[in-house]
């Protein structure tokens, strides 16, 4: 029997949420700390499935680290260079794209004999554009099942040179190449083909590389030049920011049924592009206050928007369910990459929004949402996708309860999400 959680109608939300660490930052920081010279202490590390997959992989690759009891503080002894595996290894990475893509590139350095695999859904998530680019730089990569998809067999061989990568499907392919390139023996120039999606995620990568002592020449996000033969240097300590994508649910809840909700651990100077989600809520009519270490949102009369969401694809999902509480028809554009995430998020979102009574048009790379006069009670399928579960929890901010199937799928990024939501929720 599938587990489910029924949320009763929430009359008001009010309070403060201390955000768990960012998934995007946590997994990048772990990998760079492992490759760096010196010992790095990471604090506010996210404790979630995706991060555990990265930690397990690093452990199997011979990286020594110690974790605090709550798994949010990690001390890592850096290897001072690429991984070199002496025996054949198979690493299981679940459905963690933030582990699969960067590790695939990192294991193309040095001498390796490693298979990367994961859950059935991971084997449906494309990686061909990354593999093509790695091969251009000399890497020895073999597909073990379906061409262009994991599992992959990696044997090193990447030396640098001129490579081209398609930027239109996932920014993680470029992130993976950028993080590996400084450790290649030769210089690397990466040219971007097509429109680069999710640019702010590249900024996270460049920020972290700089933190670990490596500069990248960024030519207007069209070409990146990286000197080879470098070494990452531990910064000693690094504080992982709160997860801005996770913040979106609480800020949206406040916009719909505040009170005021304040999220801490991110602020106006955050490196994560998903903080721009707050600007979208403001455009819809909510009231936003920015601090150095917080963002707060107070309820406002919400109106529909029509916006390009390419810069905040993960947080944009939250707007799709927030639209149920806005006046008019909301249109989210340029979100094709929803289709290659944990599930085909465009199809899933359209299906589940219709269940609660919304009128939805699902396009190739856009979605329109028109709210019903009254939301309908429904069992919401979550497709083993943490964000589907969290987005649809917002339905309870109406007069209608909602049942979330497989609520534990939030463990991918936010294991105690529903407990945190309950903390700020007040019933009538």
UniProtKB/Swiss-Prot annotation:
Binding, 3-phosphoshikimate: 23-24, 28, 170-172, 198, 314, 337, 341
PROSITE patterns linked to this entry: EPSP_SYNTHASE_1, EPSP_SYNTHASE_2
Associated pathway: Metabolic intermediate biosynthesis; chorismate biosynthesis; chorismate from D-erythrose 4-phosphate and phosphoenolpyruvate: step 6/7
Gene Ontology terms: biological process: amino acid biosynthetic process; aromatic amino acid family biosynthetic process; chorismate biosynthetic process
Molecular-function GO term, any one: 3-phosphoshikimate 1-carboxyvinyltransferase activity
Reaction(s) this enzyme catalyzes, per UniProt: 3-phosphoshikimate + phosphoenolpyruvate = 5-O-(1-carboxyvinyl)-3-phosphoshikimate + phosphate
Superkingdom per UniProt: Bacteria
Cross-referenced Gene3D superfamilies: Enolpyruvate transferase domain (3.65.10.10)
Keyword field: Amino-acid biosynthesis, Aromatic amino acid biosynthesis, Cytoplasm, Transferase
Keyword set includes Transferase: yes
Subcellular location(s) of the protein: Cytoplasm
HAMAP family given in the database record: EPSP_synth (MF_00210)
Entry similarity comment: Belongs to the EPSP synthase family.
UniProt-recorded name of the protein: 3-phosphoshikimate 1-carboxyvinyltransferase
Organism: Cronobacter sakazakii (strain ATCC BAA-894) (Enterobacter sakazakii)
């Amino acid at each position: 029997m599938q587990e489910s959680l029924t949320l009763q109608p929430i009359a008001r939300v009010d309070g403060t949420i201390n955000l768990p660490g960012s998934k995007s930052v946590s997994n990048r920081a772990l990998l760079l700390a492992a490759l760096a010279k010196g010992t790095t202490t990471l604090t506010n590390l996210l404790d979630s499935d995706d991060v555990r997959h990265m930690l397990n992989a690093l452990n199997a690759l011979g990286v020594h680290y110690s974790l605090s009891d709550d798994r949010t503080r990690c001390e890592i002894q850096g290897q001072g260079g690429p991984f070199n595996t002496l025996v054949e290894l198979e690493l299981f990475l679940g459905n963690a794209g933030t582990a699969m893509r960067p590790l695939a590139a990192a294991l193309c350095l040095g001498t390796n004999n490693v298979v990367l695999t994961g859950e059935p859904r991971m084997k449906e998530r494309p990686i061909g554009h990354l593999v093509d680019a790695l091969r251009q730089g000399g890497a020895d990569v073999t597909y073990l099942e379906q061409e262009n998809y994991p599992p992959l067999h990696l044997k090193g061989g990447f030396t640098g040179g001129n490579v081209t990568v398609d930027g239109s499907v996932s920014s993680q392919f470029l992130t993976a190449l950028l993080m590996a390139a400084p450790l290649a023996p030769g210089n690397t120039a990466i040219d971007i083909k097509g429109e680069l999606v999710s640019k702010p995620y590249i900024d996270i990568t460049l920020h972290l590389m700089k933190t670990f002592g490596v500069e990248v020449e960024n030519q207007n996000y069209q070409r990146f030049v990286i000197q080879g033969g470098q070494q990452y240097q531990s910064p000693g300590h690094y504080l992982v920011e709160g997860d801005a994508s996770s913040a979106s649910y609480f800020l949206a809840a406040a916009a719909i049924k505040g009170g005021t909700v304040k999220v801490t651990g991110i602020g106006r100077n955050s490196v994560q592009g998903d903080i721009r989600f707050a600007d979208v809520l403001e455009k819809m009519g909510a009231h936003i206050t920015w601090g150095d270490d917080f963002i707060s949102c107070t309820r406002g009369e919400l109106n529909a928007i029509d916006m390009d969401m390419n810069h905040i694809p993960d947080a944009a999902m939250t707007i799709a369910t927030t639209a149920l509480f806005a006046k008019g028809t909301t249109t989210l554009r340029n979100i094709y990459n929803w289709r290659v995430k944990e599930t085909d998020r465009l199809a899933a979102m359209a299906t589940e929004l219709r269940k609660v009574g919304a009128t939805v048009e699902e396009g190739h790379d856009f979605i329109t949402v028109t709210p019903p006069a009254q939301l309908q009670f429904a069992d919401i399928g979550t497709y083993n996708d943490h964000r589907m579960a969290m987005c649809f929890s917002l339905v309870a901010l109406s007069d209608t309860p909602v049942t979330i199937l497989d609520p534990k799928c939030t463990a991918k990024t936010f294991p105690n999400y529903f407990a945190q939501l309950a903390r700020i929720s007040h019933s009538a």
